[in-house]
């Protein structure tokens, strides 16, 4: 029998990823009583099997790459090698450290953390581990899961998802990646740097479709093609099967293009077609929430669902499957609960792909503006206009592209070149603050920094 928990909480949060733990910390700081339910490990996909572990692996690959090409900077490194099991072990160490950090922060703010699968029975009650918890406000932060489409033959072969690729301690000779989006390209970069023959099969006619500047994405693809990655674009995968050659343990991916059918054979197959919100397994159906056309949970600008006192943040809403979006949504939700005026804005959410070179964008793309018929002008500048970039990127170039509206306000910014991830926030701030080119120019940038490229472009 269920025991009624004497603990009543002002806020109950389902899911301990970036949305959930940010909300818990913010609510705790505001003096609210908070209970957070997490069935696996605090930090969610992002911290345990996404953002952080992939960046850790990519940094090892980038360091190895840098050492191999150190001669460009007049540094001689006689023999360079890497140790994959040690790279994986370091990744696990980094993750453990950060998970403990999240736990420490939550505990410090008085958050009750409950490990286990929670079920929402109604908007004021959550069951977990035979206990019932009562709450005034309910936050759903259940995240997303890897989506593997039902490709004919997929059940006959052994394939990797991003999670398997993160923990794999033996390098395959060859790797086929289905999906040339962010996850696909980051793993393509990692394995290519370590000497694996990589082929990317992408259904669209360009990699990184949806959110990234098409022209810059094409330039990144050209750079990786030079490094040996093969790209099959506008290629719809029709089936996968064990390779038919005798005594072969390889996997064959069959696809169709406008020019006819084709196939690629590789030792390993990585599925990175995308992610979808987690809607099942926690009693969502007991709440009767309004859904969007795409079937996601509908929320307003304060992250409130159609049921008063119930909020949804992060990947579950399906707006933007990014950790930093989830963090901001969580802040907005807690502000709504404590009565602080705030609203979610999606105008300036940066997107980054941590390849080498990095590519990043924020705000509008040329494609999104053209589609809506908005007048704009594009300003493009080679990254070589930044002295710091030239000093640190021998024999490499990149590009910075700014999109300005008819009144000269900054609408979008896109960068190909390191460290795009670190400088894109400058452009995000300009967009969020609705700065014009003139207004942005008045800000003094330290010299020499790569971020000055924006000022040069204006």
Positions of PLM-derived features:
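Beta1/beta-strand and adjacent pyrophosphate-binding region of the FAD-binding site
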Residues: 7-19, 171-181
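Glycine-rich flavin
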Residues: 8-9, 25-32, 37-173, 199, ...
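Flexible, glycine-rich terminal cap/loop adjacent to redox cofactors
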Residues: 12-16, 22-40, 45, 52, ...
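Short hydrophobic core segments
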Residues: 12-14, 118, 133-143, 178, ...
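Glycine-rich dinucleotide-binding loop and its adjacent helix/turn
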Residues: 51, 142-197, 201, 230-231, ...
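A Rossmann-like FAD-binding core segment of flavoenzymes
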Residues: 112-115, 119-127, 195-301, 371, ...
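FAD-binding beta-loop-beta segment adjacent to the flavin cofactor pocket
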Residues: 146, 295-309, 388-401, 405
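FAD-site-proximal beta/loop scaffold in flavoenzymes
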Residues: 155-171, 263-338
